[in-house]
């Protein structure tokens, strides 16, 4: 499977000329801008983790630049720094994470300590407070593979060889919708891009949409949000990530 670039470009997700009514809107941190980088997977998965914590009442805003810098140490990381949202989970467990205020620009040195609520943590210690090993499950829907078994997602960006649970598309859409309705963070990806799902909506014709938080800045008519129809979800989704708790509910 060939995978295109996810750098900032004109959106092909939100249909024009539609009026959207919000049905569910989950809490989220401000929309960020990945610029010309190919690191949408970092932004999308961090945004998913942030929304998950905000739904608990926690305040967390994480730095994508920390992970961008850390993956330079990975021998298998491509020069483009492309990856999968599951790669982000793997890298957080290995290198930790820091808050956005500690590293707001790519040229900022990676901090050795994270200060939170008067306490001092290593980035790895802080990471375990925002994303414990085994918290998340990766899902895909590939009718050429057995359902309810795990296998690698066969795309070049999966350079850490993460495993995904393969389920039917109807089940994938249903579990995604239920998770968003229950205020969980969900990460979505197609063959070109990844975004965090933060809400649900419908248009004047009754067609249903997932509201997605993009990482191309807050310009545009919806302040950096995209409206992805259920029809597009069915045809374009290659994978979804959510907590195991969200999946089991």
Label each region the model flagged:
Residues 7-11, 29, 113-249:
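Active-site signature of cysteine proteases
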Residues 34-49, 78-90, 193-194:
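Active-site nucleophilic cysteine motif
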Residues 26-38, 74-80, 158-166:
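Second-shell loop/turn segments in exported
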Residues 39-42, 63-70, 88-91, 99-101, ...:
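Structural recognition of the beta-strand scaffold that forms the well-ordered cores
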Residues 11-26:
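N-terminal regions that are enriched for targeting/export leaders
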Residues 7-10, 27-55, 70:
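Cross-family signature of deubiquitinases and ubiquitin-like deconjugating cysteine proteases
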Residues 59-120:
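Papain-like cysteine protease catalytic cores
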